[in-house]
Amino acid sequence: MNQPCNSMEPRVMDDDMLKLAVGDQGPQEEAGQLAKQEGILFKDVLSLQLDFRNILRIDNLWQFENLRKLQLDNNIIEKIEGLENLAHLVWLDLSFNNIETIEGLDTLVNLEDLSLFNNRISKIDSLDALVKLQVLSLGNNRIDNMMNIIYLRRFKCLRTLSLSRNPISEAEDYKMFICAYLPDLMYLDYRRIDDHTKKLAEAKHQYSIDELKHQENLMQAQLEDEQAQREELEKHKTAFVEHLNGSFLFDSMYAEDSEGNNLSYLPGVGELLETYKDKFVIICVNIFEYGLKQQEKRKTELDTFSECVREAIQENQEQGKRKIAKFEEKHLSSLSAIREELELPNIEKMILECSADISELFDALMTLEMQLVEQLEETINMFERNIVDMVGLFIENVQSLMAQCRDLENHHHEKLLEISISTLEKIVEGDLDEDLPNDLRALFVDKDTIVNAVGASHDIHLLKIDNREDELVTRINSWCTRLIDRIHKDEIMRNRKRVKEINQYIDHMQSELDNLECGDILD
């Protein structure tokens, strides 16, 4: 696979090369010369041709953020890289290079046409992100395993495929295998696939295809289930009660509690622990369900607030448009009258009247804006009070429920301590009938040791409960603060933008009036 430009020295993709390429492919007449003088912004370039330049490495393309078509064929590129910012790329030609591995395409989600013809590629992979891929050219490479074809089944839009002059293209079943496993393909190696060939291929590989479809359906169902679980977890996180709809918190209390796990083997502790867990989980589920309900209330409150703000802004804008329309109708009529007037005193008087109308419009628009600012400020303050109260009530009730968890832990601790002391006394007196595991028996050397072990277990459990409560309170308070800050900042930005728009419009009207010089009018 000889490259046509290997006799030249390898070149670097620097700014000079890119500027030259952009200039060469632009208009060559007067418009092109003007564009070269003023400079062409890379971000405005939609197509870039960099073939036959002996490029060794792809680099410095990050500014071409709106590029749609990139031609890099007939170079000596060894690695696909440097394309991360080309998210809008639709067409990419990397044919006639020295590429061995498909990589670096993860951000090209809009790519439809990819050519890797005449490289050194031996495996088809790492194309998962190219969900819109329609045309794939991989001819004249080193692909020798037909299983690579199965990988391409995931590309539902793929209609054209080229794999000629690969080792697999020499296989007797090459065409039939591809037609069977890629039934939506329309062109293979630049030739249209007829319906008869498709039917023969399907019949020949029907059993294997059916088995593969079954496996794909199972995998798809699993992926959908995992996605549903992720979405559900995200919903729970939004409500700040993730992992509280079961025994997760309780289990985490014992996950790092070796003493507690050992003590669970004491006679009578198993039943005690089971009762404790059941009651504890009920409280956690209550927190979880309460959290979801409160999240819905907060969402409703936020949606209502957003709708009120939108309606207020829209109504205010409509009033402003009506005032501007009325002004412009009169203003255009006045300008026409000024141009037709021949007497200078009358012209000056009419210009003063127009200027007064402009000032009156400015006052009216600014008054509308000030009214809107006051209206939105009142709405925002009311929303802030409501959401803060809702968050405060939520925290208060959660803390109350968490206190019940601590009460259960304290009760369990007392019972466990009683059983432990009783067991110690039986061991000392030799009345213990049950055999204890060695790790557990090691705790019963004296009263201090067993009391410390029970106490350490208790401390771990309380810490887990406290940490989960603190995490919930901290996160929802942070959410509330960020939300309110964002709302205030958005309103400030909206107001500044609107005032700027009003001033620009008024300045334009006044400038237009000022340019009506008496000499021009009389002429």
Swiss-Prot record:
Domain LRRCT span(s) in chain numbering: 166-204
The keyword Coiled coil is annotated on this UniProt entry: yes
Main subcellular localisation: cytoplasm
InterPro entries: Cilia_flagella_integrity, Leu-rich_rpt, LRR_dom_sf
Keywords: Cell projection, Cilium, Coiled coil, Cytoplasm, Cytoskeleton, Flagellum, Leucine-rich repeat, Repeat
The keyword Coiled coil is assigned to this record: yes
Domain of life: Eukaryota
SMART domains associated with the record: LRR_SD22
Parts forming coiled coils: 208-242, 366-391
Function text: Component of the nexin-dynein regulatory complex (N-DRC) a key regulator of ciliary/flagellar motility which maintains the alignment and integrity of the distal axoneme and regulates microtubule sliding in motile axonemes.
Record note on quaternary structure: Component of the nexin-dynein regulatory complex (N-DRC). Interacts with DRC1. Interacts with TCTE1/DRC5. Interacts with DRC7.
Name this polypeptide is given: Dynein regulatory complex subunit 3
Biological source species: Homo sapiens (Human)
